Amino acid sequence: FSIYAYSSEYMRYKIIYFFESKDPVIDITILIHDDILSKITGNEALFVYARRSNGMRIPLAIDIFEVDKMKKNYNVKLDNTMSMIKDQTLSSAKEIIVEARITKYKKAMTMPGDYIGRSLPMKINSSNYILIKINSVVTGE
């Protein structure tokens, strides 16, 4: 499944990806806790995004995947071409947090019942590696 589905946004993304600098690149390994994995139906979406550690919560880079109910590990790369707003990229931030969220609602907003994991705040280098464990449930606070 693709949120772009042959739209002009998808074409914009492909053109940007081909021509613009991708640095910095964040390599992410996502591990899903066994208790959460047992509740996955295969109808969920996995949102992986990086945002500033303070200030605006707008994703600086984002990717979205279908969740396989038997898959425990995901390997994801985020880079400058995956921003939602042209001047709000990974390279525009001094420090970021990376979050991985599984949702049955398939919406960008975090909802009660979503499963989530996040990194600690980190400074961005030209190459970064992060391990995220999805091991928490979002409550309706």
Predicted features by range, described:
Residues 64-86:
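A beta-strand/beta-hairpin structural motif
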Residues 40-47, 91-94:
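Short coil-to-beta strand junction motifs in C2/discoidin
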Residues 83-95:
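Short glycine/proline/serine/threonine-rich loop/turn segments at secondary-structure transition edges
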Residues 45-51, 97-101:
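Beta-strand signatures of extracellular beta-sandwich domains
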Residues 14-18, 27-31, 73-78, 120-141:
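Extracellular beta-sheet/turn segments enriched in Thr/Pro/Gly and aliphatic residues
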Residues 29-39, 82-85:
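Short amphipathic, basic-aromatic surface patches that mediate peripheral association
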Residues 85, 102-115:
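Short acidic/polar inter-strand loop motif in beta-rich domains
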